[in-house]
Amino acid sequence: MIKKMLKCSWLIIIASLAITAFFGWQLRKISIENTVRMYMPQSSESYQRMLKAEEDYGSMMVLGISMETSGETILTPEYIKIVQDVTDQIGNVDYVESIDSIANMDFIVGEDGSLKASSILGEDYSGTAEDMAAIKQRLVDWQEMYNRVIITDDGKTTQLMITLQPKDENGDMLNSKRQMKALHDIQKICETALEGSDLEVRYFGDPVLSDNGYTFMVSDLLLLIPFVALVVLLSLYFSFHTWSGTLLPLITVLMATVWSVGIMCMLNVTFTIIGSVIPVCLVACGSAYGIHVLTHYYIGLDKIEGEITKENHAGAIEYGLKDVWIAVVLAGVTTVAGFISNITSPIMPLKSFSVFAAAGVVFSLILSMTFIPAMLYVTPISKVGKHWRNKNRLSAKLKVRLEKQLKRQGGKTSAEATTNTLYMVYHFFSGTKPRLIVSTAILLLVAIIGFKMLIVDTALVNYFPKDSKFRQDITYVDENLAGSNTLYLIVSGEEKEAEEAPAESAGESVADSVASDFDFGTSENNVADSVASDFDFGTAEPGTADDFGFGEASNAATDDFVFADASNTGADFGFGDMADSSETAEAPKQYYMLTNPEILKAVDGMQEYLLARHDGIGKMVSFTTFIKRMNQVMNAPVNDDKLSSIITVQQGLEMLHKAYTLAGGDKSNVADIVAELEKQLNFNGIDYYEIPYDVAKYPVSARSELGDLVTQYLYLLSSQQIQRFANNMTMPTAIRTQVQLRTHSTEDTEAIIKDAQAYAEKHFPKGYKIEATGNGEMEYTMTKMVVDSQTTSILLSLAMVFIIISLSFKSPWAGIIGAIPLGLTILLNFMVMGYAGIALDLCTSIIASVAIGVGIDYTIHFMETYRTQRALTDDLEEVTKNTFKTSGRGILTNAIAVGLGFCVLLFSRFIILRYIGALVAVVMFTSSTLAMTVIPGLLNAFDPKFMWSKEQKEAYKKQLQEEN
């Protein structure tokens, strides 16, 4: 078989190079993506909930821009002109859905008894001093909406929030490439507009993360692959001292890497931060197979006596393959078993890493057993002899040095010194049963303490170093504005059951209903005085009161509902197609409405509750923010008679004392006292900045009727902004609360979500539920997925280790003994992460796979050698010493080589990859050390029969028979 393969050497070489060229050409299709959306399984509830929310409220893909002045304030005509220009131009950039800035955000005002969405800048803004004063006043008048959203507390920074379309022109998810194009176009606009000014601009959001992730990854790939290749190259040269021994293993592993990554590109599998570990992983681990083949090939050359000929050279190659192919295949299979364990993960980057890292190992294995022998076979004999003579000459020079070193080591060779050291380490920790038990117990205790300190966090921003411009900009936004992370809480009305939904008359058109139910006249006073004139509550035509919940059917407000599947004109109001008769048409679905003051009050209370409990929340804006503002505007005094009235000193002191008391007494401050005074006087309607809820405050007989008032407000106002917070402008069945987070910790996000859910369960009226969505929620969901997939992958990999070792040694006890040090290795890895404060996330979760994939080789290597030595003698200490002498140094050398290969990740621009580099190096040390301490300790303590030779088993049986 091998001889036939060698005769086809040129065919193998040409085919291998052709395949490499083909997959190398595929690399031009590489697609780099690093967004939460791409990481999330698209079939998951979290992802689908996000898509539904974007359908109802608009895109949640946000790009933020902050502009900071070194002067006293950003509110100057010059700076506002810059913001206006930037706002206008960005609106024309491809893939931009909307932009919010101080230049175009709505400011709700009252006009002729109605509501109007005006502008913060005012209708006739010209940049005068009066205009600037008016802008400042408007910002103060609605601080819940604007403060830290478009301007900082110190007034030196303004913020622009750009929403990108979630899908491209083909209807596909807007990928990183298009996001970055939009970002670069926007950056050019800002650079031009800010030229000559002192404004410092900062960018944050999904597109910025994608852009920085792309830049960092390309930089890493260009640096780290050559670096790890150099490390492997040097280690190979010092191992073999020949060009063939140096270059061939490296070439094969580079070819395998091209094949693996090329297939990824051909299959349109996106390349992520996790994927960038694959080339380094394959180069560091995959070269071992070529080293095995070449080592035994050189042993075959050493056996040649006389001149090297074509025939005996082919014999040396054949000898090398025959002697090693089983060991190489077993090593490859076990490594694949470790890497493939993440195949069960629902997170696509982890799944793709698992598949293509395992594929790369298989390719390295195949090329090591085909391409390397073929290259050796076609090498001219003259060069083979020359290289071998050069190696021997170099070995002669080294021999002199080794003899000197031998004297310094007390007559021991380097190998003997290493063997003695390893044996002493084993004997100290596991030389006897008590030592083994005590050492293991201490190890477990320390490891469990560290494991409990382990945190799980999947925030992608943590992949970048804190001193990077990207992280510094995010930190600035989190400290000075509302925050750069976003969580959305969706409150929705559930579908009513048949007995809860009143029978409705669907024969009248919506247009007729609106005309009969509403009389949008002018109001001279506030809404509380004008409800009767604006609405016809008493004598609505049959069906109209039921349609809108007005009139004497006041209980309809309590049972607020909306019809689903609206179309045509009815769609504007949330009604379905009412053209068919009620007898033949299918009954429309009815939902609990979000105009119900009970639920609106509860949502507003939830906001106050969450803000008080969580420092990580920088801002909360919701549908209720608009309702409160509309209620305030419509209840502001038209004249200032009350404010102009003369009061006595006694009355003034009483008002002041009351305000002082309501503000908190000695715990209050001037701002709180002034706010309470303004409420007493209803200054600018501030006493009505609330959800209409108190029946005594409004001209209604029951709280249920206040839902009609909310509905009226919604009909009176037309604002694009409010559309982002309600799924229907007039009859909403779901509303959204936007939570701006100053933290990227998924633990904090989890606490906020659970608190919101607990509050809703306790305080929301029947028929309403709450759900979370957005980037913050998806990162939190990924955290749970990482924990689940990590647990599954570890159990799966340990199960595969158990099966492989059990089959190799034909005993389940062998599988258990072999799995113990690997299990301890994984536990120690988590311990180190816990003590070091390194989070378990998407990237660090692959370390367990690497630990098992590589560590199992050390376990099998040691156990195989131990079995061989055990067959030679019954003296277990002698067996152990000989095992260390035969395999100890090889295991240690391989662990150091792999660890050094991964250490090149310490030079990555990603902080998370630096962690992986350090952790894998630690894992290589612990896995090799445990293989050479725990395993011999267990084998010597229990002397299992699966390690005995056939002759020893028969002798033992014979001894038992004689004793009986």
Where are the regions that the model predicts?
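Signature of alpha-helical transmembrane segments and their immediate interfacial
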Residues: 1-34, 373-374, 378, 382-460, ...
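Interfacial segments of transmembrane alpha-helices in multi-pass membrane proteins
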Residues: 3-9, 218-271, 344-348, 792-837, ...
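Extracytoplasmic
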Residues: 43, 48, 51, 55, 81, 92-243, ...
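Pore- and gate-forming transmembrane helices of large, multi-pass membrane proteins
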Residues: 221, 250, 289, 302-345, ...
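Hydrophobic, glycine/alanine-rich multi-pass transmembrane helices and their short helix-loop junctions
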Residues: 235, 329-372, 802-806, 828-839, ...
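Hydrophobic transmembrane alpha-helices and their membrane-interface caps
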Residues: 245-293, 812-864, 903, 930-934, ...
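Juxtamembrane segments of multi-pass membrane proteins
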Residues: 418, 422-654
